[in-house]
Swiss-Prot record:
It is found in: Cell membrane. It comes from Synechocystis sp. (strain ATCC 27184 / PCC 6803 / Kazusa). Keywords: Cell membrane, Manganese, Membrane, Transmembrane, Transmembrane helix, Transport. One of its GO terms (biological process) is transmembrane transport. Residues 47-48, 93-101, 163-179, 224-228, 277-306 are cytoplasmic. Residues 1-25, 70-71, 123-141, 201-202, 250-255 are periplasmic. GO terms for cellular component: ATP-binding cassette (ABC) transporter complex; plasma membrane. It holds the Pfam family ABC-3. InterPro entries: ABC_BtuC-like (IPR037294), ABC_TroCD (IPR001626). This is Manganese transport system membrane protein MntB. Coiled coil: none annotated. It comes from the Bacteria.
């Protein structure tokens, strides 16, 4: 056996983490979270809701703290405060002359600050570092169940309302004109966004979860005009980053969420530079070759070809 290890050091490096049950559990949980985030990421990217995702991810902090203090599932507290923040944003926006970005900034920082106050004042077993950056390597069985439930609900809702959500994200005015209840779609998308953040909380934490919600869809958006292909690229890049990031975090003894996002960002940079049609190199080549009529269409064919 020792001779085999010496002869095949890479194989030993590869299989060593698989000897530990906690790491195997962390890998498949991360992969599931990556799948959920990737699917929703395509809709968030088309809708331009990256800031909304950031707001909700910060707003769940007081919910998590209170949930642990009251000994109730963290998913309930996180979803309640996350969705509550979106309702607050919509209410303040409708009652004032402030623009949405200003309202989002005010609401999410207020919720986040409340969470920090609660962390320091309410006795609980909540580790602020784990809230901020995740703790998938130490995830409990109860947290896994909550993550699976939240993620599964998100996937089911998106599957059932896929076309309606896509039309709402791409052209809400047209969706309203054909009789689609855009207000329902608005809160449906916000609900699954809050659920996805709850699912990803243990893997990436509130600081890094926004990257998992935005980057996969952005990668797919750069690589393809078709929404189904965009979805495929998004899922592959996200799941690959989650599995590889969890794996490498063990070997290099670094933050799992941080490593996942580093790999995901690296894939984005590669796509940004080398995407066949919308990459930097392709655009520079077209500039030197002369104008291309297809450039005027940009990404509007995403929905046309679904």
């Amino acid at each position: 056996m020792n001779q085999l290890v010496v002869a095949f050091p890479f194989w030993h490096w590869l299989v060593e983490p698989l000897q530990y049950e906690f790491l195997i559990r962390a890998i498949w949980v991360s992969a599931f979270v990556g799948l959920v985030c990737a699917v929703l990421s395509c809709y968030i990217t088309l809708k331009g809701w990256s800031l909304m995702g950031d707001a909700i991810s910060h707003a769940v902090v007081p919910g998590v703290v209170l949930a642990y203090a009251l000994n109730i599932p963290f998913a309930i507290g996180a979803f309640t405060f996350g969705f509550g923040a979106t309702v607050a944003i919509g209410y303040v926006k409708s009652k004032t002359r402030l623009k949405e970005d200003a309202v989002i900034g005010i609401v999410f920082t207020g919720f986040f600050a409340l969470g920090l106050v609660l962390v320091t004042k309410i006795p609980s077993n909540v580790d602020l570092f784990h809230i901020l950056f995740g703790n998938v390597l130490g995830i409990s069985q109860q947290d896994i169940i909550q993550t699976l439930i939240a993620g599964s609900i998100t996937l089911i809702v998106i599957l059932l309302r896929r076309k309606d959500l896509l039309l709402f994200c791409f052209d809400p005015n047209h969706a309203k004109a054909i009789g689609l209840r855009t207000q329902v779609m608005y809160y449906t998308l916000l609900s699954v966004l809050a659920l996805t953040i709850v699912a990803a909380l243990q893997t990436a934490g509130i600081i890094l979860v926004i990257s998992m919600l935005v980057t996969p869809g952005s990668i797919g958006y750069l690589l393809s005009d078709r929404f189904d292909h965009m979805l495929w690229y998004s899922v592959v890049s996200s799941v690959l980053s989650c599995v590889l990031g969890t794996y490498l975090s063990y070997h290099f003894d670094v933050s799992t969420g941080g490593m996942i996002v580093v790999i995901l960002t690296t894939l984005f940079v590669i796509a940004m530079i080398g995407a066949p049609k919308y990459g930097i190199l392709a655009q520079e080549w077209r500039k030197r070759s002369g104008p291309n009529p297809e450039d005027d269409e940009n990404q509007t064919v995403v929905v046309d070809q679904v």
